[in-house]
Amino acid sequence: MKSDLFSGRCGMTLTLLLLLFPYTAKAQTANSNHPVTDAEKMTDALRAGPKFITKDATILDWPVKAGGEYRVLRKGTNEWTCLPGVPGYSHDEPGCFDPVFMQWIKDSLAGREPHITTIGIAYMYVGAWVPAKSGKDITSKSDEFHVGPHIMIVSPRENQKELQSFSRDGSNGMPYVAHLPNGTDLYLVLPFRQWDEK
């Protein structure tokens, strides 16, 4: 069963905000490969970024409802935070976030408008499943493709126009931008390895 955090239309919007990928509710099916125990969640979260970050990062578990508390699985000593894949998401997609990106997530989850004054960076070493064209709803498996390990960047709204020159098509492995459904703020995705490369 999905947690209250990710149920319903509101929860779906929050999920989109959290992971920056424009999935539809039709893609939100439980995945039996998702971590369940705390040990599994920690292992999953540690897959999300480079070891020089993950080895000292704080590991959190997602709150069970909107506005809820994140549960600390391991207290870290650097400024990075890693989380396992989102419960109930169609694919397991853990991430590691710098303080700006993490604050952006927390603001979004709490229903606050994110206020960031500098760029925020996130790693997704496991990659993610995204639409063939950024912003297109996924209605079937044939609509989606896997973006390999990548970095994501969010920026303050005053910098948005600088992102508009990037392509919105992420299917060719090149850097691209996308925006949330019903939103205009762009975020930048920088793949650095194809998903099938070892």
Label every model-predicted segment.
Residues 2-13:
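Bacterial N-terminal signal peptides that target proteins for export
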Residues 5, 20-22, 165, 191:
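Intrinsic disorder/low-structure terminal segments
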Residues 11-22:
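Bacterial N-terminal signal peptides
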Residues 23-27:
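Sec/Tat signal peptide C-region and signal peptidase I cleavage site
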Residues 29-198:
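Primary mode marks residue(s) on the alpha4-beta5-alpha5 output face of response regulator receiver
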